[in-house]
Every structure is written in C-alpha cells, then in structure tokens.
C-alpha cells in the first residue's frame, strides 16, 4: 500500500470527493439506446438523448432501483419523494445544453462509508467518511481533442454522444478525508461496494468511475475552512493520492509565501505530476437549476424499499469484520479476499466444502493469486474448483499428502486435474515399519556423513532426511522421517 507524503504539521487538509458511478443498465436513463461501451462513435444515440424537439424522457426503472440500493448500502436515508432538475450549461459534449440531474431533493442523503487502512504492523485502522448525498443524473458525451489532451492547444475536437444519457449516480462525501491515502482508499471502497451490489462495474479505464476532489488546507486547530480547489482528470487510484498530495504541498507553499488561494478547478497532469489551472470554479447559481418539467416527481414506496433492502448482499466491510472475528483471519488476508466479490465467493464455497479457513486463505492469497497475476486470469477461469481446493487441503491436514506435494501438483490442478488423479499412488508413507528400513539403508550407505554428524556437524541431519525423501519419491511423511532419522543418528 502506498504511504502518504508527510504534510507539514501546522496545516491540515480538508478533502471531499465527488464520485460519478455509471450504472450497469442495458439502456440509457431516459431512452432505449444501448449503454454498451466501445461502440462506434455516435451510434448509441436517439432523439431523446440528443434533445431533439418533440420527444419526452421516460425514467428507466432499473436506474431508480440501482440508485436506491447504492444509497442503502451507503447507510443513507432514502427520500420517499424526490425529483429531477435541469442543470443549465453550454459545452460541446452536452447536446441539449442542459443536463437532467437532481438538485435540492436527491434520492438519498446523510449516509456514511467505512474505510480501512493497515498500519505498519498490519493492524486495521477504520474510519467512517460521511456521505452528504447521492443523486441520479445523465452523463454527457465525450470530447476527443487532436494534438492535446484538452481544448486548449488542440487543433480540432471531435465529439462522441454515445455516452450522453448514460445513467450515473453522483456520490458526494462530507469533507471528512484528511490525506491522499484516505481519499484513494475511500474511492476504492466505494468501487468495491458498487461491484458487490452489481450496480456498476467501476472500470476507471472505461469511465465508469470518475472522481473529482475538493481540497483546502487550514492551520491545525482553525475551524474555518480554507478556500476550496477542485481537481479533475485523475484516472487511477494512485493518481488520486498523488494529485492530493501535490495540491496540499502547493497550497501550503502558496499560503506561506503570502499568495491568495483562489476557488478554481485544476487538472491533474500525470506526465508532469502536478495540477494546472483550468477555470474559475462555478457555483450552483451559475447553473440556474429548475425542476425538470418533462418528468414527474419520483416516489419510492415502502414495498419497493423493503424489497430492494432484502436483496442487498453482504458488503465488503461486513465480510472483513466477519472473516476477522469469526474465522480468525488476518486483516491483510481479509482485504485480499474481499477485494473482488468473486474471490470472496470462491473462498466461501471452499470453506463450505470443508476447507480450513486459514489454509484456504493462504492458498488463495498466495499460490493461486500468484498464478492468476502471472496468467492475467480471473479466479473463475481456473480449473481448480473450490471443492477440489478443499479436497487438497483436507488431504494435507489428514497426512495423506504433504504440502510440498500439493504445491508441486498445483499447476496441473489449476488446469483442471482432479485431486484423485493428481495424487493417485502419491499418498504419504506414514507407517514406521515401512520407513524405518529405508532410513537404515540411507544411513548405512553414507558412513562418512554419519561420522561428520556424530563429530558435531548436526546440519547433516537434513542430508539424511533428503535422501529418504528422494528414495521414496517424496512420499515419506516429513514429520515421521525427521523423527526416525534423528533417533537413528543419535542412537
């Protein structure tokens, strides 16, 4: 985990995030056009999302369901009644010259999200970040600038309206975050929650998860907030952390040199690792919000709320707490296992099939994870089923095979070979009457090594154990072999 840059102790940062999550619906928020990513430019469009005269928007009911579920998962109060509003601004990627969003009556508000960081000793440090609001809105199109990554400096710009009208939820945090590390973890935990719910894939590289940061600094102990600066254009969690750490340093240096911090929007430049000024930050009055006249107010009934609440899965933080408290796993293992919902599902099927939880966690977070990373595979793409992993672990714990044998056969097991076939004829020799003659034979065949051992070179015990394992094709029970060899050498 990336460590945070040290901030001068006389100042503290006040940070909040505005996160846009694209909802995983098949069609757009107010029309029937596809939301599929990667289509040819301007093919997933229709008269509604283009704002042509004479057409009316109709709310996609799945959007409401997903937004409410997200609000519930974030411990928000769900509004019985809410409405849509028009947010007025002119930009080439906005075909209607207004965006349908929610202003004063959002679908959800007053929630919180728990984040977890590990200290130097691997112990979890937990903190609740307040959620101000969650609201539904439509996305804008996408601009592509030739010769630059923004309009300034480009030779010309192209616009793709496929994304216009794609459903989003915007989640606004309270200014409870204090470091870039906390901000990056908040964004990652938010993505985990959305993925567990199945309401968003959270792919930053496809624009399904986008974060804007609001940040100010103030002297420690001062209650009044400093001047807020917004940062955009962060395309990874590490970029979020680095942009915040840079901006904290920039603002502190400016204050200490007597400069005035202005309320503005700045862009993070990955290449130069700095923020640059983009524009003066707008206020809500600049957007001239008013109620959307073409959409009726939204009502969430008690029946809907009860149904959607009952469909919520166990969420990442809940799993982490259960794995630590009930299964005795380390904070590190619980983080790895709960990072991806399909990994946690694999783990839980394995222990339901009889696997020791700690052993299953070790195999999944170490050997299997290394294989997945190397092969660039998902855990659903390997041939080793959770039940077969449980079988392997049980064979080790009952002394039928050794851990070394299991690791040796792991590549074949991962491609689908069953434990029965993998370990046929490979059971450990754990009968002393069978092993003892082999130990005697090995010692008799190596008189020089025996003499050296008895003259004080006790490390040669490992040599004799290794020879026994070699003669038995590693089938000798390691623990029993060690005992027999030691008794014979010292006899």
Swiss-Prot record:
SUPFAM superfamilies: GatB/YqeY motif (SSF89095), Glutamine synthetase/guanido kinase (SSF55931). The keyword Ligase applies. Pfam families: GatB_N, GatB_Yqey. It catalyses: L-glutamyl-tRNA(Gln) + L-glutamine + ATP + H2O = L-glutaminyl-tRNA(Gln) + L-glutamate + ADP + phosphate + H(+); L-aspartyl-tRNA(Asn) + L-glutamine + ATP + H2O = L-asparaginyl-tRNA(Asn) + L-glutamate + ADP + phosphate + 2 H(+). Allows the formation of correctly charged Asn-tRNA(Asn) or Gln-tRNA(Gln) through the transamidation of misacylated Asp-tRNA(Asn) or Glu-tRNA(Gln) in organisms which lack either or both of asparaginyl-tRNA or glutaminyl-tRNA synthetases. The reaction takes place in the presence of glutamine and ATP through an activated phospho-Asp-tRNA(Asn) or phospho-Glu-tRNA(Gln). One of its GO terms (biological process) is translation. It comes from Nostoc sp. (strain PCC 7120 / SAG 25.82 / UTEX 2576). InterPro entries: Asn/Gln-tRNA_amidoTrfase_suB/E, Asn/Gln-tRNA_Trfase_suB/E_cat, Asn/Gln_amidotransferase, Asn/Gln_tRNA_amidoTrase-B-like, GatB, GatB_C_1, GatB_Yqey_C_2, Gln-tRNA_amidoTrfase_suB_CS. Belongs to the GatB/GatE family. GatB subfamily. PROSITE patterns: GATB. One of its GO terms (molecular function) is asparaginyl-tRNA synthase (glutamine-hydrolyzing) activity. The keyword Glycosyltransferase does not apply. Keywords: ATP-binding, Ligase, Nucleotide-binding, Protein biosynthesis. Its EC number is 6.3.5.-. Heterotrimer of A, B and C subunits. This is Aspartyl/glutamyl-tRNA(Asn/Gln) amidotransferase subunit B.
């Amino acid at each position: 985990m990336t460590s945070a840059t040290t901030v001068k102790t006389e100042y503290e940062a006040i940070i909040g995030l505005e996160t846009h999550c694209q909802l995983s619906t098949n069609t757009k928020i107010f029309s029937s056009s596809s939301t599929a990513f990667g289509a040819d430019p301007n093919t997933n469009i229709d008269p509604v999302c283009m704002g042509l005269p004479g057409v009316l928007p109709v709310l996609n009911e799945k959007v409401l369901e997903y937004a409410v579920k997200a609000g519930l998962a974030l411990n928000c109060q769900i509004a019985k009644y809410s409405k849509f509003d028009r947010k007025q601004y002119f930009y080439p990627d906005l075909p209607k010259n207004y965006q349908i969003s929610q202003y004063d009556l959002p679908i959800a508000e007053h929630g919180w999200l728990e984040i977890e960081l590990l200290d130097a000793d691997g112990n979890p440090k937990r903190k609740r970040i307040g959620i101000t609001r969650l609201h539904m809105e439509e996305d804008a199109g996408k601009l592509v600038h030739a010769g630059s990554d923004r309009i300034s400096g480009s030779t010309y710009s192209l616009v793709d309206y496929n994304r216009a009208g794609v459903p989003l939820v915007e989640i606004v945090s309270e200014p409870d975050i204090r470091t870039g590390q906390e901000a990056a973890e908040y964004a990652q935990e938010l993505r985990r929650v959305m993925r567990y719910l199945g309401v968003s894939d959270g792919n930053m590289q496809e624009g399904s998860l986008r974060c804007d940061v609001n940040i100010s600094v103030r002297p420690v102990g001062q209650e009044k907030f400093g001047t807020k600066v917004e940062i955009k254009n962060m395309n990874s969690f590490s970029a979020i952390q680095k942009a915040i750490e840079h901006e904290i340093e920039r603002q502190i240096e400016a204050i200490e040199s007597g400069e005035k911090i202005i309320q503005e929007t700045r862009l993070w430049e990955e290449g130069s690792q700095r923020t640059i000024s983009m524009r003066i930050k707008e206020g809500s009055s600049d957007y001239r919000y008013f109620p959307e006249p073409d959409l009726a107010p939204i009502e969430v009934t008690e029946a809907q709320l009860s149904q959607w609440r009952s469909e919520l899965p166990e969420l990442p933080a809940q799993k982490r707490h259960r794995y630590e408290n009930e299964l005795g796993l380390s904070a590190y293992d619980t983080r790895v296992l709960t990072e991806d919902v399909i990994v946690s599902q694999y783990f839980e099927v394995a222990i339901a099939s009889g696997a020791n939880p700690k052993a299953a966690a070790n195999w999944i977070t170490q050997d299997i994870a290394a294989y997945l990373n190397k092969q660039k595979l998902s855990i659903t793409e390997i041939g080793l089923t959770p039940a077969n992993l449980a079988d392997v672990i049980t064979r080790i714990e009952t002394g039928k095979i050794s851990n070394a044998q299991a690791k040796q056969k792991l590549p074949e097991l991962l491609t689908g070979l069953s434990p029965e076939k993998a370990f046929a004829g490979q059971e450990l020799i754990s009968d002393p009457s069978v092993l003892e003659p082999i130990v005697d034979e090995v010692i008799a065949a190596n008189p020089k090594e025996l003499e050296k051992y008895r003259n004080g070179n006790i490390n040669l015990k490992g040599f004799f154990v290794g020879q026994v394992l070699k003669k038995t094709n590693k089938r000798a029970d390691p623990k029993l072999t060690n005992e027999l060899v030691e008794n014979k050498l010292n006899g």
